[in-house]
Design a protein with these regions (language model features):
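Acidic, small-polar-rich N-terminal luminal/periplasmic segments of exported/outer-membrane proteins
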Residues: 29-163, 631
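C-terminal beta-signal and adjacent terminal beta-strands/loops
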Residues: 31, 456-459, 463, 701, ...
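Outer-membrane beta-barrel translocator/receptor signature
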Residues: 105-107, 119, 128-137, 142-225, ...
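Periplasmic-side early beta-strands and strand-to-turn transitions of outer-membrane beta-barrels
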Residues: 154, 161-163, 169-171, 187-285, ...
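Structural signature of Gram-negative outer-membrane beta-barrels, strongest in the C-terminal barrel
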Residues: 230-232, 429-432, 438, 442-446, ...
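A surface-exposed, glycine/aromatic-enriched loop/edge motif typical of exported proteins
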Residues: 239, 243-318, 373-396, 449-486, ...
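Membrane-embedded beta-barrel scaffold of Gram-negative outer-membrane proteins
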Residues: 351-357, 361-367, 373-377, 582, ...
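Gram-negative outer-membrane beta-barrel transporters
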Residues: 527-530, 650-652, 669-857, 926-930
């Protein structure tokens, strides 16, 4: 479908070409925008693809500062950052990046100057000195270097020219925001050699208040610079070199506020009081609405791995967060540690175009990028009000943890970091023959290497490690005050990854991808053209597995062997076929009709490392496939003063990749789905100086029949015949949840053995062995007959059909895909007032609304995210003769704080929810000068 409103209206330059017509009419012709969506320059209205394009002026006019703002101007698009390092979900028509892990590919390919960016800064950096930002909707693998089942975002930088030009912009806004942008273009040898230098910086105060220490966090301190060199030694040979650097060092919050409907644990089970055993029967948080007052509770620490171990070893007694609630203000947090965010990247590109003849052009495009990210923040987002018990390990309730520091509070920190390197080499041959047959073919080699580290560091984990140093095998050399000589405890302030007193999910990952792709065009006549595109892709993925087992052997636990290194190969042929036709309808000036069938593909991958034997985890996940049908029309009407474009689409999706967190790791699964919808985009200039625009997107998604998945937030599906129990430290999945028969649990409680329930989660035989093991050896010390009865004769492990110790799978049939609102709409209007002295004033307003959606495939009330809207207004004064522009703006006029996405953690973390919110009201004033 066609141009977005912003795509065609450029505010800092004349947006319309006036035609000679009677003064009474005073209508205007909307300026034509040239794009390269098909790797060649074409008028946007002539491109048979659903594409929205934005010039730098358009981005500025609509206050689209970066990738997250694009959703407010494009139908059927949603955007949210993810929970982990340098990750985000840009979703088009329900397809995005819901799989989590180093080997998971984006469903929407992000490109810079047509080169794929596996790890980019789309959600961190801001747009500056760009020629265009193009967003293509639908599968695009036959022309773009990395497969993209959902679409493509292509950021095209402004290139050096043979004319001197420069501009500078200084902006000041609320939150003490200072934003500077500038560019200078310097021709050196006429049209043969030129250099273009551009840059941007942003420094502002934070949006969030940490009420624990009164610090303002989630600030920004970042900059980016870009240098390009154009060298065209001949008319036939044209080259361009680019270097771009990005740097950030601030307190950006990787996640938003943490919500939890506290689970206090049941007072009774089967009519039997639980007493102190209730601490082993809580899952931390319950699946309540994120908008209910109860959602501002705190995690029951007994439902977490760290709290479970603290209770078992006596450092804590139940919920360390008892009585704690959080502020109902989504921009207030309470954490012992302020967030830290550091990011650096360098990108290098070299593009060569050589005209082999007047009708044949060869293109070589080389791209290399390298980057690193380091982030840390408080994991539980609340300061526990109850101190540690006073024990030999915690004298006076205090403990000096090597990573957390000296405190008497239950404290957990997560550190997410990574470094990456990528290289791509693409060759392309494109024809422009006079005859009916033309082509655009190419090949790409792409390599990507990354090492991601995700740590969860807790003083309760270190305390448990020390306790186990003295248990069973005994290690009297372990010093509980200094942690010196304690087996498996990392004494470094910055974790090295060698200790087992913290959780470290370390993933070295390598991707090697090769592909041949291209399209052939047959022009039957001047109005009708057929297109055939094919792509052959081969992906090779490898992950080196590291043990993620906490509390390793040598001090009390049995270590399952680490899973072997994983390798996977995926090979697939995809393509598209269709036609476009320029129709003469009589009532339009120009009409383009098009229809295409395409097959999209995204490779499968390898789930992040887990200990062998962990419950319910597959080592790999399968590829995605989509069969897509799209029909559309692009129309120019009313003597060029109206653009009206429409697209309808239907997708048959096989293997849509989704993720959930199980046993402290991301587990990616596949589901089938149907997707259909339509999009409308229109621009109208009824009179001179007035422009109106509107977009409407409708999206319907439906998961296929027979699809099911265990919902870790509700493992029993609310069936009272079963009870959730925490998994004890004897299992590789320690801290997770299991499901046991309620009658059996009640019998165990009635026998006074409720404290042994966590050891039941590995089955009857292991439970019986624990019960009968002497207490001095770490067991319960019960008589053999009693142990046999409790493990085998209580019905503890009796399950109906479909149930298991993991729970029962929820039926997903007919559910909606996550982050897929039914409706996305936007409207805009601007009017330019001509003032005296060569000045003009342009007033513009934009409004966007998104209907409700679900954060997960389970579509429960807990998953429901409410509809939200946003309004922006700008006022700009121009004096072209001076090259001066002064503008003022307000973004998010209503200062609303919508929840735009939510992340559910795993059972061992208490099933809390990190929510992602939009920016608050922002306003400011700026002055620009161009030369």
């Amino acid at each position: 479908m066609g141009a977005s409103a912003a795509a065609i209206s450029a505010l800092a330059v004349p947006a319309f070409a006036q035609q000679a017509r009677p003064a009474a009419q005073q209508t205007t012709v909307i300026e034509e925008l040239v794009v390269t969506a098909q790797k060649k320059e074409e008028a946007l209205q002539d491109v048979p693809i659903a594409v929205s394009a934005f010039s730098q002026d358009s981005l500025q006019a609509q206050k689209i500062d970066g990738g997250p703002n694009l959703q407010q101007a494009i139908p059927n698009v949603s955007f949210a950052r993810s929970n982990f390092t340098n990750s985000f979900n840009f979703q088009i028509r329900g397809i995005g990046a819901k799989a989590v892990g180093a080997s998971a590919d984006q469903g929407v390919g992000v490109h810079m100057n047509n080169a794929p960016q596996q790890s980019g800064n789309l959600f961190e950096s801001e747009f500056y000195d760009v020629e265009r930002v193009e967003v293509l909707r639908g599968p695009q693998g036959t022309l773009y270097g990395r497969n993209a089942t959902g679409g493509v975002v292509n950021v095209i930088t402004a290139k050096p020219t043979d004319q001197f030009e420069a501009n500078a912009r200084a902006e000041y806004g609320n939150y003490n925001a200072i934003r500077l942008r500038g560019m200078v273009n310097m021709p050196i040898l006429g049209d043969k050699l030129a250099v273009r230098v551009a840059g941007t910086m942003l420094k502002r105060d934070g949006f969030v208040t940490n009420t624990f220490n009164n610090h303002v966090v989630d600030d920004r301190d970042l900059y980016s610079t870009r240098v390009q060199v154009m060298f065209n030694p001949t008319e036939k040979l044209r080259t361009n070199f680019l270097w771009e650097r990005f740097h950030e060092d601030d307190s950006r919050a990787r996640t938003g506020k943490q919500l939890c409907t506290k689970d206090p644990g049941p007072a009774t089970v089967g009519g039997v009081p639980t007493g102190a055993a209730a601490r082993y029967l809580t899952q931390g948080c319950l699946p309540g609405s994120l908008y209910a007052p109860a959602a501002y509770g705190s995690v029951n620490t007994s439902g977490t791995l760290t709290g479970l171990l603290g209770n078992i070893f006596g450092f804590t007694s139940g919920d360390s967060n008892a009585g704690a609630t959080t502020s109902t203000n989504l921009r207030e947090i309470e954490t012992a540690l302020d967030p830290l965010y550091q990011s650096n990247s360098n990108t290098y590109q070299f593009t060569l175009n050589y005209d082999l003849s007047d009708a044949l052009t060869f293109t070589a495009m080389t791209s290399y990028g390298k980057g690193s990210v380091y982030t840390s923040q408080d994991y539980n987002r609340v300061v526990s009000p109850i101190p540690f018990n006073s024990t030999p390990f915690t004298p006076g309730g205090f403990f000096n943890d090597p990573q957390v520091g000296n405190t008497n509070k239950f404290t957990t920190i997560d550190v997410s970091s990574g470094r990456s390197e990528q290289f791509s080499q693409e060759f392309r041959l494109q024809s422009a023959f006079d005859g009916p047959l033309n082509f655009n073919v190419g090949g790409i080699h792409f390599t990507y290497r990354t090492l991601t580290d995700y740590y969860v560091i807790g003083n309760s984990l270190t305390l448990s490690s020390m306790a186990l140093n003295f248990q069973k095998t005994g290690n009297p050399a372990c010093n509980p005050s200094t942690t010196a000589n304690c087996i498996g405890i990392d004494t470094s302030a910055t974790p090295t990854g060698d200790g087992h007193n913290y959780y470290d999910n370390r993933t070295p990952y390598t991707l090697v991808s090769d592909a041949l792709f291209g399209e052939v065009y047959y022009q039957v006549n001047e109005d009708l053209k057929f297109t055939l595109g094919l792509r052959q892709t081969r992906d090779k993925k490898a992950v080196k597995n590291y043990s993620t087992v906490l509390l390793a052997p040598g001090y009390g636990l049995t270590l399952n062997p680490t899973n072997p290194d994983q390798r996977a190969r995926f090979t697939e042929t995809t393509g598209r076929v269709g036609f476009d036709y320029k129709a003469n309808l009589g009532f339009t000036d120009d009409t383009l009709l098009y229809a295409f069938y395409s097959k999209g593909y995204k490779g499968g991958g390898i789930n992040p490392g887990v200990p062998a034997g962990a419950i319910g985890i597959s080592q790999t996940f399968a590829p995605e496939f989509v069969n897509a049908i799209e029909i559309g029309t692009k129309n120019t009407l009313a003597d060029g003063s109206v653009l009206l474009n429409a697209t309808g689409f239907r997708y048959d999706y096989k293997g849509y990749q989704i993720s959930k967190i199980v046993n402290r790791t991301s587990v990616n699964e596949n589901v089938d789905a149907k997707i259909w919808g339509f999009e409308l985009e229109s621009i109208w200039s009824p009179v001179r100086n007035l422009k109106l625009n509107a977009t409407v997107g409708y999206l319907n998604t439906k998961i296929g029949d027979g699809v099911s998945s265990i919902d870790t937030m509700n493992r029993t599906q609310s069936n009272p015949a079963y009870t959730v129990v925490k998994v004890g430290p004897q299992a590789s999945s320690v801290g997770a949840n299991c499901v046991l028969n309620t009658v059996g649990v009640a019998t165990i409680l009635g026998a006074g053995a409720g404290a042994t329930l966590p050891w039941a989660c590995t089955g009857a035989a292991a439970y019986q062995a624990f019960l009968s093991t002497p207490a001095a050896a770490g067991g319960a010390g019960l008589p053999a007959a009693t142990a046999a009865f409790l493990a085998n004769s209580t019905g503890l492990f009796n399950y109906a059909n479909g149930f298991s110790i993991e729970g029962v799978a929820a039926n997903l049939s007919g559910n909606e895909l996550p982050n897929s609102p039914h409706w996305t709409t936007s409207v805009g209007a601007q009017y330019t007032f001509e003032l005296s002295g060569g000045w003009s004033a342009t007033l513009r307003g934009d409004y966007y609304r998104q209907s409700q959606q679900f954060a997960r495939v389970y579509n429960t009330e807990y998953d429901r995210l409410k509809a939200w809207d946003n309004g922006n207004i700008t006022l700009k004064f121009d004096k072209p003769d001076w090259g001066v522009t002064i503008d003022a703006y307000v973004k998010n006029i209503g200062n609303k704080i919508p929840i735009i996405d939510a992340y559910t953690t795993d059972d061992s973390s208490g099933l809390f929810t990190n929510v992602i919110t939009a920016e608050p009201r922002l306003y400011g004033i700026a002055i620009s000068k161009s030369w």
